[in-house]
Amino acid sequence: MLTRLSHILNNTLTKDIHVGFRKMANVADHYNDPVSIAVIGGTGLQSLPHFTHVATLKPSTPWGTPSSPISILHHPSPSTGKPIPIAFISRHGLHHELAPHEVPARANIAALRHLGVRTIIAFSAVGSLQEEIKPRDFVVPDQIIDRTKGIRPFTFFEGGMVGHVGFADPFDNKIGKLVRQCGHSLEGEGVRLHDKGTIICMEGPQFSTRAESNMYRSWGGSVINMSALPEAKLAKEAEIAYQMICMSTDYDCWHDSGDVTVEMVMGNMKANAENARRFVGAVLDELSKEEHNEVVLAKHLEGEMKFAGGLTAVPGRSAEAKEKLGWLFPGYFE
């Protein structure tokens, strides 16, 4: 059930986030240097030690404004000690004002790419569809089944320019490998990790019926949430390496352990919050190492959309579509 309650929990944690990290005396409203790494979620990351809030940005994009201001945090590189900028965005807004289908995912992803972001770590609380994935376990998924209903805008390529991008592997294998290594390094210290799994991304905001929950289990679903899509698809279109980290807070309604309550979910989330912070903090430490620069900059994805998004012949490309995509991909479609 928490899958669908995850946005409630994320909001609760977001309140803690914005009072937990170290703020500079004067936080800037601009940031001129490229930011390669971003976190999407509401997980308390800014309360991690050694993160300093240096800027709060309020960008606009051709697809609207993001779901929250973007916080820029400085994090010392484990390799050099130099500050590494990390962008943080709250998926459901600072005050949890956005339902899952209202999240402006295109604006979120576009704003992050425009900043220079090429790697996204997304965090999501989820419900478990399998007995072996217990509450408080972490899952680094490798697949998604789309059970959204087309309500959410899900592509940058429309209105006069068509683009097709492969989505066989919805999460980035290179970033995923590093995330799994970090998770396994914390096992035995409160972290229990499942290093693959299939997310069912449902539309919401209502919860599943028992029949639906059992159907998802029969399909091989591992966990369920409302957040993975269209976020992962848009990141793929934007040539951004994307990996979600899931934290199980309950069994979905298929389980005979009884109805899930908000109190139960909140209890598990609170009890595991420190493990979540340590996990994501370890991932950011690893990604900040100079040896991973090529992976973090997603050089293996660079230029993919120049071909995949160039399907529409030049005479057929609308001025509006060219302008929007030119903002996202400068120089690609001139």
Please provide the spans of the model-predicted regions:
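Non-catalytic positions within long, well-ordered alpha-helices that form the structural scaffold/packing
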Residues: 113-116, 217, 236
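Zn-dependent metallopeptidase/amidohydrolase metal-coordination segment
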Residues: 226-263
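Acidic, Ser/Thr-rich low-complexity intrinsically disordered segments
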Residues: 303-334
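Metabolite-binding pocket within alpha/beta catalytic cores that recognizes anionic/polar moieties
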Residues: 2-5, 9, 13, 20-168, ...
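His/Asp/Glu-rich mid-to-C-terminal helical/loop segments that flank catalytic regions of hydrolases
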Residues: 252-303
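Mid-sequence, gly/pro-rich, charge-dense loop/helix-turn segments that line enzyme active sites
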Residues: 123-213, 218-219
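Generic hydrophobic/aromatic pocket-lining and core-packing "Φ" positions
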Residues: 109, 213, 229-232
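Glycine-rich tight-turn/loop motif centered on a GG-T
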Residues: 160-168, 221, 256-268
